[in-house]
Regions:
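N-terminal subdomain of nucleotide-sugar transferases
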Residues: 1-64, 249, 411-414
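Conserved donor-binding/catalytic core segment of Leloir-type glycosyltransferases
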Residues: 220-237, 242-246
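Donor nucleotide-sugar binding/catalytic pocket of nucleotide-sugar-dependent glycosyltransferases
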Residues: 45, 152-211, 221-222, 283-286
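A short helix/loop element that forms part of the nucleotide-sugar donor recognition site in Leloir-type
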Residues: 55-61, 206-220
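Nucleotide-sugar-dependent
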Residues: 237, 290-299, 304-325, 330-342
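Nucleotide-activated donor-binding/catalytic signature segment of Leloir-type glycosyltransferases, i.e.
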Residues: 261-262, 267-295
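A charged, aromatic-enriched C-terminal amphipathic alpha-helix characteristic of glycosyltransferases
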Residues: 356, 360, 370-403
Length: 414
């Protein structure tokens, strides 16, 4: 950044510090990094927490110079109840905060909640400033894939036109991988405006294994082989194939456990399915842990799991996978062919199976249990790939480049 006037960046994301959800920790990393690079950074966010944490929430962005403006909380209780009303309230609070503060040199938004995208795009257009979109999801396609909207409905056509305009108006759109980039091009985003920046691991990236890991005792894991699912259990994640494959594997090798650490809209549904399948004694559920205990929660894993529902490929990319790779944990991915397949194939760091392939999932689990040396080698390969191409420092530098490119476009118009 030049030594003249500090460039002003406004970020919009509903969930921000202090927050346990990985999707909110990433913008915290980005905004703190930019503030330390000399940018004048302001974040407009909500007061609700998607995944509240007990204990230390990690570094406070305000200590790095980030200004935080919050839309006050409307409702208490479960964040997943009355979700649309909560989002509407956030939009109503967002608009005056965008219009009444000093104009930014660049506006940046993630895709949460969805209508943030066209709102921030419109304000950036009104202010004649560049707009940078971080596409954690692709809308309204995610809503259609979930079955909430019919593709041919009038509402979806209106939303499609609105989001298509917003995506195309962005000076830069950050994509999480090549499959998502293809979705964005299909939406009309020019390929030369797309920048691929993978998510990175949040929290402490070490692992604590063996008897030193207190969670093995707290969660009653003993010396069993552990599959770990860590993170959000949302609308885009599929669990039936995983649970069926896990159940079949346990019929052959009893010393296997599944640990699910996280929250999300499908958590209760997953709990119920575990009970229906008679897997209650083999599956452990736990809340998200504070950042300082991530080395322990990740350290229980012999094999880490990511899933994706059919139709969600390229619409979302599970951010838990870079977290697994950073810690040297091999990955079992169950879902349609997606950006996760690209990572697993590139680094030879695990298994990629399709939804419905119960036999394949069973075989992968048994293979992982039966050849620990090969499994450890895959974990090391994934970690080496992460350090070489995906680590936090590289991602932050790429985001700074994206912001710089957007600002160059502004200077070009001057």
């Amino acid at each position: 950044m030049n030594a003249g006037r500090r460039q002003r960046a406004i970020f919009v994301e509903q969930f921000y510090f202090p927050e346990g959800w990985g999707g909110a920790e990433l913008p915290r990393d980005i905004t703190m990094y930019l503030a330390r690079q000399g940018y004048d950074v302001e974040v407009i966010c909500g007061a609700d927490l998607y995944a509240p944490l007990e204990g230390d929430p990690g570094p406070d962005p305000r200590a790095a110079g980030v200004c935080i403006r919050r839309v006050p909380r409307l409702l208490g209780g479960d964040i997943h109840s009355l979700k649309l009303l909560r989002q509407l309230w956030f939009y109503m609070g967002l608009v005056p905060r965008l219009l009444c503060v000093r104009a930014a040199d660049v506006y940046v938004a993630q895709t949460n909640p969805p209508l943030t995208v066209p709102i921030v795009a419109a304000v950036a257009r009104l202010r004649r400033r560049p707009f940078v979109l971080i596409a954690m999801d692709v809308y309204p396609d995610v809503i259609v894939a979930h079955g909430v909207l019919a593709a041919e409905s009038v509402v979806n056509r209106v939303l499609e036109a609105t989001f298509r305009w917003a995506y195309r108006s962005a000076r830069c759109v950050v994509s999480l991988g090549p499959v998502m980039s293809g979705r964005l091009v299909a939406k009309g985003v020019a390929s030369d405006r797309i920048r691929e920046v993978s998510n990175w691991a949040t929290g402490a990236t070490g692992v604590v294994r063996g008897p030193a890991n207190r969670l093995r005792e707290e969660w009653h894991l003993g010396t069993d082989f552990v599959l770990l699912y860590s993170g959000n259990l949302g609308i885009g994640h599929e669990f039936e194939t995983l649970l069926q494959g896990f159940m079949a594997a346990r019929r052959i090798a009893m010393g296997i456990l599944l640990v699910i650490v996280g929250k999300g809209s499908r958590l209760e549904e997953t709990r119920q399915r575990v009970q229906q399948l008679g897997l209650g004694s083999a599956v452990r559920f736990a809340d998200l842990v504070p950042a300082e205990r991530l080395p322990e929660s990740m350290g229980v894993a012999d094999l880490a799991v990511a899933t994706l529902r059919e139709g969600f490929e390229g619409l979302i990319v599970p951010s838990k996978v870079p977290g697994y790779l950073a810690r040297g944990i091999p990955v079992l991915y169950v879902g349609p062919r997606s950006d996760i397949d690209h990572l697993i194939e590139r680094y030879d760091c695990g298994y990629a199976l399709r939804n419905g392939d119960v036999a394949g999932v069973t075989a992968a689990i048994l293979d992982a249990c039966g050849d620990r040396e090969r499994l450890l080698a895959r974990g090391r390969a994934g970690q080496a790939g992460y350090e070489s191409e995906l680590r936090r420092e590289l991602g932050l530098a790429r985001y700074e480049t994206v912001i710089g490119e957007a600002l160059e476009s502004l200077r070009g118009k001057a």
